[in-house]
Amino acid sequence: MKMIVGLGNPGSKYAKTKHNIGFMVIDQLCEKYNVTLNKHDFEAEYGSFKYEGETVLLVKPLTFMNDSGRSVGPLMSYYQVGIDELLVIQDDMDLTMGKLRLRQKGSAGGHNGIKSIIAHTKSQTFKRLKIGIQHPQKSTVVNWVLTPFDKDGAPVINQAIDQACEAIDDWCQNDDFMKTMNKFN
């Protein structure tokens, strides 16, 4: 079983903000695979589909970004998902707008949602799919991540979401994250 977690903040107020790029990817995967996030336990909404016989959980933690691990850890335990089968989709200010970067493991890199997942899983060895939102030029970090993409950024991000879904499909299909990294990084 694979578990794909998109990071974001719950509520319509945050729906189109940069920090919610993980939720946006999950939404597109739900559309592609006809999944409804109809389960509401573990402070998350989630659903599943079968990919060539393997169950894939799509998860949106509802704890707000900085407490995402409070949802992810218990879900992993309940469904007996190994740390090697967890993929977390996150925004990354150190990457240019729309750039994808896949990683096998790593530190939180200043991302509080990732920091929370590391704390609750007691591991840094889970997979990441990072999508660049670039660093703010003039605004503060909080204002930057909690504002929507502008008219120039929106098409770039829509393309990045498509690429992220392709990368996830690739990983589900070949079950070799290193191959997927080499293809999409």
Swiss-Prot record:
Primary role: Hydrolyzes ribosome-free peptidyl-tRNAs (with 1 or more amino acids incorporated), which drop off the ribosome during protein synthesis, or as a result of ribosome stalling.
One GO BP annotation of this record: rescue of stalled ribosome
PROSITE patterns the UniProt entry points to: PEPT_TRNA_HYDROL_1 (PS01195), PEPT_TRNA_HYDROL_2 (PS01196)
Residues annotated to bind tRNA: 14, 64, 66, 112
Subunit structure: Monomer.
EC numbers for this chain: 3.1.1.29
Keyword annotations of the record: Cytoplasm, Hydrolase, RNA-binding, tRNA-binding
Family of the protein in this entry: Belongs to the PTH family.
Name of the protein this chain belongs to: Peptidyl-tRNA hydrolase
Organism lineage string: Bacteria, Bacillati, Bacillota, Bacilli, Lactobacillales
Annotated site (Discriminates between blocked and unblocked aminoacyl-tRNA): 9
A molecular function (GO) term: tRNA binding
CDD domains: PTH
